[in-house]
Amino acid sequence: MSSNNEILFARAQKSTPGGVNSPVRAFRSVGGTPRFITRAEGPYFWDADDRRYIDYIGSWGPAIVGHAHPDVVKAVQDAATRGLSFGAPTEGEIRMAELICQLVPSIEQVRLVSSGTEAAMSALRLARGATGRDTIIKFEGCYHGHADSLLVKAGSGLLTFGNPTSAGVPEDFAKHTLVLDYNNPQQLEDTFKEIGNQIACVIVEPVAGNMNLLPATPEFLQTMRRVCTQYGAVLIFDEVMSGFRVALGGAQSMYDIKPDLTVLGKVIGGGLPVAAFGGRTDLMQHLAPLGGVYQAGTLSGNPVTVAAGLATLKLIQVPGFYESLATQTGKLVAGLSAAARAANIAFSANSVGGMFGMYFAAEKPQSYTEMMKCDVAHFNTFFHAMLDAGVYLAPSAFEAGFVSAQHDDAIIEASIQAARQAFAQLGQ
């Protein structure tokens, strides 16, 4: 007899490509049937078969205060009674912008949009418009949404201009995108010496979370800041994932580096669709209606989303919030590592704030190339053992995990105990 999840997946595939609205949800890389979620609360969610799971994806980052937090739910309910969307400015948008500028010192002005892809795409357009240059630099393994210019992966040559890695991306778009190695400061410096006056911007995840978890080295980001300043290129930190996730001021506050523009998302919407890009006033003044760089959106600054975001940002400003979050994430990572050692499994793990990564490799990867050498088959087996034990991890070996403020000691210990059993099975 088919489970409710299997029935829903079969039904979904008839009306939705692949049965999902974002590819990783399909379980294609790990195999099996995706879980269709019916409700969530705190650190848990429940699937269509009423099975409860400890959740470590947290909607891919936004659920930092836990699912269905009463303060966030009330803010959404109150806002909804006043209207869902106006197509006109509101005071809530001002409050959100003021708060972001207050919490992220590099941001002097900010504009709200509806998705991380839209924010990254707009930041690139702004950088090109402000500099009058076309070439952008991104790094292999970093994900900045699905805009055409950013779906590019380079070959191995130092100055190899990328071929599109998604069907439907014209080479004329891809040719302006140069892809370099993450955590390779010398390659970056050499590239700027070669074509620095042609480069409009460099965009980077300071804590990469879409090739599993891979933090940038301080030297890498310091070199980036220096050469961008030297050659007049715009430095863009994509903190859609790390912003308000690893620290109150984002990863840039941890590294003490000021980008020219920052892209935000996820946490600032409290679980509803929103993103933002902001930075230096002289750059932001190039945006319409003041300047010639056009950007607009029907639902930008949506009042219900803004209400959820403001409620979430209030909760994460409580003293000790990030210290506690990092402590719990560290306990999880230490417990997973100890369980793997006990089972003699080649495994390593890392954490930054409320993000963590698991690698089926003896040492923590330091580059995209090293990350690709991790044992995916072992991860897939581990994933399903944990899923069967009621622990929901990212259904991909190359996605970061997320801990919320609701993951207390009992939740962490239950997760580690499940991992002990999963590693033991893997070692047989």
Curated annotation (Swiss-Prot):
This is Glutamate-1-semialdehyde 2,1-aminomutase. GO terms for biological process: protoporphyrinogen IX biosynthetic process. Pathway: Porphyrin-containing compound metabolism; protoporphyrin-IX biosynthesis; 5-aminolevulinate from L-glutamyl-tRNA(Glu): step 2/2. SUPFAM superfamilies: PLP-dependent transferases. GO terms for molecular function: glutamate-1-semialdehyde 2,1-aminomutase activity; pyridoxal phosphate binding; transaminase activity. It holds the Pfam family Aminotran_3. One of its GO terms (cellular component) is cytoplasm. It comes from Herminiimonas arsenicoxydans. Belongs to the class-III pyridoxal-phosphate-dependent aminotransferase family. HemL subfamily. It is an enzyme of class 5 (isomerase). It is found in: Cytoplasm. Its main location: cytoplasm. It catalyses: (S)-4-amino-5-oxopentanoate = 5-aminolevulinate. The modification N6-(pyridoxal phosphate)lysine is found at K266. Its EC number is 5.4.3.8. Disulfide bonds: none annotated. Homodimer. Its cofactor is pyridoxal 5'-phosphate. Keywords: Cytoplasm, Isomerase, Porphyrin biosynthesis, Pyridoxal phosphate.
